[in-house]
Amino acid sequence: MGQEVRYRVRGGHALHGTAFIQGAKNAVLPMIGAALLASKGRTVLRNVPVIEDVRRALELAEYVGAKVEFHEAERTIVIDATGLNDPNRAVLPASIASRFRGSVLFIPALMHRMGRARIEGVGGCNLGSRNLDFHYRGFARLGAEVTEDPERKHINVKADNLKGGRLYLDTPSHTGTENLIMAAALTPGTTVIEHAALEPEVLDVIEFLGSMGAKISGGGTGFIKVEGVSELTAVEHTVMPDRIDTGVFAMMTAATGGDVSLVGANLDHLGVARWKLEQMGVQFTQQGAVLRVRRDPNVPLRPINAVTSPFPGFATDLQPPLMALATLAEGESYIREAIFDGRFALADELNKMGAKIEVEGNRAIVHGPSELHGTKVTAHDLRCGAGAIMAGLVAKGETIVSPAYQVDRGHSHFATRLSALGADVVREEVS
């Protein structure tokens, strides 16, 4: 029998103190892919989150021929991609890609450096009908030849005759926007991306690529223009703070009635989530690079209505922890998931703990307040796992959340950081 890695949470402890917010997962992953576009120099990325998705990305980078150093204690990555020239290594193997959805972010580098790419599987969070077709349609619009085998075992991309073109995203996906910008950066001619994402992470990736020599304009407007250049050069860059990490810690502080200072957090990056949390009774104070979050435990949380939408709207990645927080509010909360279907997996787990949540299609009705009780729950995906741990912080008794891997994909040293704030959280291996 193999080892199970899980989180064990004992509730009843308010969070107090100081926590450091990690670098942004959704910025560093495309930056690792973009670093492979550099034919000169060594890329240095700082403020890198020590998470499983970063480790998978670096495994892929090494697999295709890059030299990689991950200095975890310093949260720094060094990537030398000057040796990416063997077309036989232009493969993203299922052994890694099936566990790591961000593997699609490596296709632009393989297209430009090796002339082709093959992806044998995609992984990450299981979110309903979410798929990657729009990435491949974008590559094809730039002149790539994209073919899929009959049994969907892998996808082949050939890039012999790339040229700039006009691209349109049906939904303003941050991953899709970043990927198409990377594909366009070394493609001859002018590429225009309409309905592009506005997320802060996209702007950080654009800044990174611009430092490398890419010619990109229109970031933050939804209409991005890329003038192809002949080469990109490696640079040093500090990754922005993770706004989802910020939101999760803010909600955990609110749930426990705590008072926490989040170092490196940026309140503006929360978008609508900031206003929704304030409506519930959460207080924010930004002083320089420190965001103070507090909630009076003697004042009940107010119920909320929230609809997920692209930035600056309410982030879909914060919807599961918001659901957990809403179980504590006095009254009915209504949450509509407008980005991904199948993202209410946490509802069943919270109901096991004593919550009263009804799911009707893409809408959840949370009847609060509920007294939560610890039990064994499943982390169906990364954000579901974070929401379950959050519920465990306020539940009576002990909550077991597994597999830990899902949470580890997106939150670095989660148990350590929570324990430093007074929580009783342990990440453990059991037979």
Swiss-Prot record:
<comment type="pathway">
    <text>Cell wall biogenesis; peptidoglycan biosynthesis.</text>
</comment>
<dbReference type="InterPro" id="IPR036968">
    <property type="entry name" value="Enolpyruvate_Tfrase_sf"/>
</dbReference>
<feature type="binding site">
    <location>
        <position position="101"/>
    </location>
    <ligand>
        <name>UDP-N-acetyl-alpha-D-glucosamine</name>
    </ligand>
</feature>
<keyword id="KW-0133">Cell shape</keyword>
<feature type="binding site">
    <location>
        <position position="317"/>
    </location>
    <ligand>
        <name>UDP-N-acetyl-alpha-D-glucosamine</name>
    </ligand>
</feature>
<feature type="binding site">
    <location>
        <position position="339"/>
    </location>
    <ligand>
        <name>UDP-N-acetyl-alpha-D-glucosamine</name>
    </ligand>
</feature>
<comment type="function">
    <text>Cell wall formation. Adds enolpyruvyl to UDP-N-acetylglucosamine.</text>
</comment>
<dbReference type="GO" id="GO:0019277">
    <property type="term" value="P:UDP-N-acetylgalactosamine biosynthetic process"/>
</dbReference>
<protein>
    <recommendedName>
        <fullName>UDP-N-acetylglucosamine 1-carboxyvinyltransferase</fullName>
        <ecNumber>2.5.1.7</ecNumber>
    </recommendedName>
</protein>
<dbReference type="Pfam" id="PF00275">
    <property type="entry name" value="EPSP_synthase"/>
</dbReference>
<dbReference type="GO" id="GO:0051301">
    <property type="term" value="P:cell division"/>
</dbReference>
<dbReference type="GO" id="GO:0071555">
    <property type="term" value="P:cell wall organization"/>
</dbReference>
<dbReference type="GO" id="GO:0005737">
    <property type="term" value="C:cytoplasm"/>
</dbReference>
<keyword id="KW-0670">Pyruvate</keyword>
<keyword id="KW-0132">Cell division</keyword>
<feature type="active site" description="Proton donor">
    <location>
        <position position="125"/>
    </location>
</feature>
<dbReference type="InterPro" id="IPR013792">
    <property type="entry name" value="RNA3'P_cycl/enolpyr_Trfase_a/b"/>
</dbReference>
<dbReference type="InterPro" id="IPR050068">
    <property type="entry name" value="MurA_subfamily"/>
</dbReference>
<comment type="similarity">
    <text>Belongs to the EPSP synthase family. MurA subfamily.</text>
</comment>
<feature type="binding site">
    <location>
        <begin position="25"/>
        <end position="26"/>
    </location>
    <ligand>
        <name>phosphoenolpyruvate</name>
    </ligand>
</feature>
<dbReference type="GO" id="GO:0009252">
    <property type="term" value="P:peptidoglycan biosynthetic process"/>
</dbReference>
<dbReference type="GO" id="GO:0008360">
    <property type="term" value="P:regulation of cell shape"/>
</dbReference>
<feature type="modified residue" description="2-(S-cysteinyl)pyruvic acid O-phosphothioketal">
    <location>
        <position position="125"/>
    </location>
</feature>
<keyword id="KW-0963">Cytoplasm</keyword>
<dbReference type="GO" id="GO:0008760">
    <property type="term" value="F:UDP-N-acetylglucosamine 1-carboxyvinyltransferase activity"/>
</dbReference>
<keyword id="KW-0808">Transferase</keyword>
<dbReference type="InterPro" id="IPR001986">
    <property type="entry name" value="Enolpyruvate_Tfrase_dom"/>
</dbReference>
<keyword id="KW-0961">Cell wall biogenesis/degradation</keyword>
<keyword id="KW-0131">Cell cycle</keyword>
<dbReference type="InterPro" id="IPR005750">
    <property type="entry name" value="UDP_GlcNAc_COvinyl_MurA"/>
</dbReference>
<keyword id="KW-0573">Peptidoglycan synthesis</keyword>
